[in-house]
């Protein structure tokens, strides 16, 4: 199936009433999640995973994907109007977006953020169409050694690009791999780490772990922190940027698109890094860098375009290789696996309706978001006034009901609560949960690839060095580890000398 016939079939799928509805629901929830500070797309997707069990694979993926890129749109609203980022990737939008609002230019700020997001998101969809297919053709030839090496590189990159301590992120990777080993050994059939609990024979469920780490812990953190939200009260008008605004913004939008898309493909990269790098780039090349932080529209246009382009780019390694580059894609991968579909090069051939349905839904979703965001600014502002003491307990109740409804099993509710408390403690001690989740989902594939490789080579580890792709990826992973150790040593050199 060529690209254009595939896209046409995708539009036929997405315009089916049920899929159109789930596309709309996904982007609406995503926008809502982006607008409300403190929840985020990861927590929302984790909480909504149980609702996808009764859906077809294409409907569930359309909805979850809509939540992801919808949250990138919605995050700019609170950054501009409240000076609180609704989504982590919109942090830098606060710097100039809120200043524009204070100057009476909230409308153009919101407008350019929406149009930039549309352009960046649309370009990234073209990128998925034209890159995923040839990459999948190459990946079909991958064997267990190549997949083992790629997963190693993915996990090392998630540590290397983490925002906190590299050592803490490495501990999270190891913890995720250990948790993924709970249950029945796929080769010997013996149980591991179940401690006599029959429920754990099939392993720890993805949904209670995700809901606990990203849903319950988020509720606990937000109940503890009282965010002072000074709502922008002036009337938002003139949402369409004028000609001067477009002249200033067109360059940042183009640069943000071409910067954000490849950063989204990189494991451990994504929308947050893309938005920060875009802002830094625009400030560095500006003739008047002192304007940044004082209401420069370029500081809104570039980052908002970049984070949406990165969001689209992150679908490529998941759909073409079966390797999630970040925790949100890991949750999408989990949703596919739950529906009996293994992401990767064969998925595009075996389930073309899923691949092309999602691609077409992203085109439709980006248009819906533009039409949804700008006219409903007043509604989003009213939602910002809902107190957290009302909102967060409702989210917690939703988590409890969702976890129990999976298998009508109280044990899974207990698992969710345990991981919720663990996630809260981890965040208090500045441990990132994202590397843990990536390792937890990739762990079984990583282990199977490792063991299959050794069976193929009669137990010889040299098989990983005999395959060119495996050798290159392992060499890159090794270089990243060495570089991390050197950076850590230089950073703490004085402390080592004095001790």
Segments predicted by a language model, with ranges:
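Membrane-embedded alpha-helical modules
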Residues: 111-228, 338-493
């Amino acid at each position: 199936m060529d690209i254009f016939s595939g896209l046409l079939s995708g539009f036929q799928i997405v315009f089916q009433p049920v899929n159109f509805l789930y596309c709309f629901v996904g982007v609406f929830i995503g926008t809502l999640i982006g607008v409300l500070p403190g929840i985020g797309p990861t927590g929302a997707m984790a909480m909504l995973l149980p609702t996808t069990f009764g859906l077809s694979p294409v409907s569930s993926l359309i909805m979850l994907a809509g939540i992801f890129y919808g949250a990138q749109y919605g995050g700019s609203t609170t950054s501009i109007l409240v000076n609180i980022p609704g989504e982590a990737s919109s942090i830098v939008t606060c710097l100039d977006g809120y200043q524009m609002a204070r100057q009476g230019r909230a409308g153009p700020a919101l407008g350019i953020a929406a149009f930039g997001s549309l352009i960046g998101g649309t370009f990234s969809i073209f990128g998925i169409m034209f890159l995923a297919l040839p990459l999948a053709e190459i990946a079909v030839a991958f064997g267990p050694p190549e997949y083992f090496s790629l997963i190693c590189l993915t996990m090392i990159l998630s540590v290397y690009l983490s925002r906190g301590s590299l050592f803490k992120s490495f501990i999270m990777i190891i913890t995720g791999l250990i948790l993924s080993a709970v249950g029945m050994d796929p080769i010997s059939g013996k149980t591991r780490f179940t401690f006599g609990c029959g429920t754990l024979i099939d392993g720890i469920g993805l949904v209670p772990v995700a809901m606990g780490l990203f849903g319950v812990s988020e509720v606990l953190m937000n109940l503890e922190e009282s965010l002072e939200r000074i709502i922008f009260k002036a009337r938002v008008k003139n949402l369409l940027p004028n000609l001067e605004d477009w002249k200033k913004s067109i360059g940042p939008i183009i640069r943000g698109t071409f910067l954000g898309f490849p950063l989204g493909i990189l494991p451990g990269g994504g929308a947050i890094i893309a938005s920060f790098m875009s802002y830094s780039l625009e400030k560095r090349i500006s003739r008047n860098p002192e304007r940044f932080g004082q209401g420069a529209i370029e500081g809104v246009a570039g980052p908002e375009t970049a984070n949406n382009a990165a969001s689209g780019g992150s679908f490529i390694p998941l759909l073409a290789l079966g390797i999630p580059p970040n925790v949100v894609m890991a949750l999408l991968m989990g949703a596919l696996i739950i529906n009996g579909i293994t992401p990767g090069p064969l998925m595009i051939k075996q389930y073309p309706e899923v691949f092309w349905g999602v691609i077409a839904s992203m085109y439709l979703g980006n248009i819906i978001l533009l039409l949804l965001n700008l006219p409903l600014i007043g509604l989003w502002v009213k939602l910002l006034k809902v107190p957290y003491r009302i909102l967060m307990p409702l989210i917690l109740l939703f988590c409890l009901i969702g976890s129990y409804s999976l298998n009508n099993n109280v044990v899974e509710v207990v698992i969710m609560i345990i991981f919720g408390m663990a996630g809260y403690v981890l965040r208090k001690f500045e441990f990132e949960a994202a590397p843990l989740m990536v390792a937890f989902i990739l762990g079984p594939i990583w282990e199977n690839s490792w063991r299959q490789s050794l069976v193929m080579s009669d137990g010889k580890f040299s098989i990983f060095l005999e395959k060119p792709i495996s050798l290159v990826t392992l060499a890159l992973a090794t270089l990243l580890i060495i570089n991390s150790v050197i950076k850590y040593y230089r950073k703490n050199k004085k402390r080592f000398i004095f001790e």
